[in-house]
Amino acid sequence: MMQNNNELTRISIAILFITIFIATVNCSLLNFASSANAETAQQIQAKIDQKNLDIQNLEKVIKGYQIQIDDLGSQADSLSSTIKSLQLTQKKLEANISVTKDKITTKTFEIEQLGSQIDTKENNIGDDQRVIAQSFKQLNQMGNTDITQIIFGSHSVSGALNTLEELSVMQKNIFDKISSLNKDKDQLEVNKSASEKAKSDLLSLNKQLADQRKVVLSTVSQQDSLLKQTNESETSYKKLLAQKKAEQAAFQAEINNFESQLHMLMDPLKLPSAGSSVLVWPLSSVKITQYFGNTDFSNANPQIYNGKGHTGLDFRASIGTPVIAALSGTIIGSSNTDLVRGCYSYGQWLMIKHANGLSTLYGHLSLRSVSVGDKIATGQIIGYSGNTGYSTGPHLHFGVYASDGVQIKKFDTSINCKGATIPVADFKAYLNPLMYLPKQ
């Protein structure tokens, strides 16, 4: 009877080994099938690598355009240099569009690649689960065999030891399968998260592409408008600049008069402490062209600044440069003073109210990609830099305010800018942005 039990045990062990062997062969066949598709995976990776190389080459071209634009910006302001700068800007923007298209293609390939990896992992998990379930079933069937029956039912001590060793090996194989299963599950979650992020990035890139195309059209329109206004005459261009300066000064005088009468209650304790670096830079590459307060430029133009100095920071930023939110918050203001004929101020602008008592302003944009009421994340693209409003060249005006001391006002009775909407503030509400930005 013991001999029969021993034979049954050996048969069960053999069946279990065969089960694991067949499952292993199936996995090998699956891996072989995967290797048959590996060429496709390699081709996808090769395409990704090629697109990344294309992007690097285009970025070199863009850098070359930017150097030429910066050189023109350092020259005396003239119609010819302005037109040439706009033409170079258009070429740069079109190159930016090509980069974004390549990024979209690359991201699409990455999503395809991750999808294939997810399918493979799910198949592996299913196979491992079936092997483990079958193995446990076989072990349960063997569970009724007492170990003494295995030992004393064997023809020899070595036979009994071999049987026990076979059981030990089986147990290890099952544990290995469980470990492999857990690793596959972990990697599956990683791949799924990466796939979701890639899909989110793809949506952002498609929106960015649409925005960049709008900026190109805006640049072409700006160039055509300038040529019509000046009739391609340098003298007419100089007169136009002088007219803009005079009209901007007149509107600024109205603003200064209004703001001087504002006496809003502000609690300094509600504001972040200076040096806290609660904001991030609104551009990926930072070059400050005018600081906060009484700068050389503001002192040289008292008719514009009225002795209160420059109310923010100016950053060098060619037309179409992505502008990002310095901190999460809500868009509380958005307008375009250029829509009011003869009104030269911030041009296209946005204001974000943050939860820490601060509000930030982004002026002279070429395009706004968010709307009033939108919830914004730190670092999110909210628009693109430009040369709108009263601007001596493409740049970003960045202002920081105490939220309790600033309001959005529509100038319904303005002499110079009737209907224009801009932020106005108690003089004490204007804050130096460098108090809250990281050190360069």
Predicted regions and their residues:
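Long, contiguous alpha-helical "rod/stalk" segments
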Residues: 57-137, 209, 220
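Sec-dependent N-terminal signal peptides of Gram-positive bacterial secreted proteins and lipoproteins
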Residues: 8-34
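N-terminal secretory signal peptides that target proteins for export/translocation
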Residues: 1-9
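Non-transmembrane, heptad-repeat alpha-helical coiled-coil rod segments
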Residues: 67-70, 74-89, 171-239
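Extracytoplasmic/periplasmic cell wall- or extracellular glycan-interacting regions that localize
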Residues: 228, 232-354, 358-363, 367-369, ...
